[in-house]
UniProtKB/Swiss-Prot annotation:
Upper lineage: Bacteria, Pseudomonadati, Pseudomonadota, Alphaproteobacteria, Rhodobacterales
Protein name: Translation initiation factor IF-1
Similarity section: Belongs to the IF-1 family.
Domain S1-like: 1-72
NCBIfam families listed in its UniProt record: infA (TIGR00008)
Disulfide linkage: none
Name of the gene: infA
Function text: One of the essential components for the initiation of protein synthesis. Stabilizes the binding of IF-2 and IF-3 on the 30S subunit to which N-formylmethionyl-tRNA(fMet) subsequently binds. Helps modulate mRNA selection, yielding the 30S pre-initiation complex (PIC). Upon addition of the 50S ribosomal subunit IF-1, IF-2 and IF-3 are released leaving the mature 70S translation initiation complex.
CDD domains given in the database record: S1_IF1 (cd04451)
Top-level division of the source organism's lineage: Bacteria
Gene Ontology cellular component terms for the protein in this record: cytosol
Record organism: Ruegeria pomeroyi (strain ATCC 700808 / DSM 15171 / DSS-3)
Length: 72
């Protein structure tokens, strides 16, 4: 799949779940399950409840996503 096929949305982390997954509420009101991107894990960027994040999703499954940026 090409990178152009991803959808990006800003959101807020609502809950921490096991295995580095998070419940994220998007700006449009939808709640999804998201995991951290590999570069965020490698650089040990912490994501806590209440953080504003950028979530990337595929158009095929709009219930799961990947957190690729945490806003400061």
């Amino acid at each position: 799949m090409a990178k152009e096929d991803t959808l990006e949305f800003p959101g807020v982390v609502k809950e921490l779940l096991p295995n580095a997954t998070f419940r994220v509420e998007l700006e449009n009101g939808h709640e999804i399950i998201a995991h951290t991107a590999g570069k965020m894990r490698k650089n040990r960027i912490r994501v806590l409840a209440g953080d504003k994040v950028q979530v990337e999703m595929t158009p095929y499954d709009l219930t799961k996503g990947r957190i690729n940026y945490r806003f400061k």
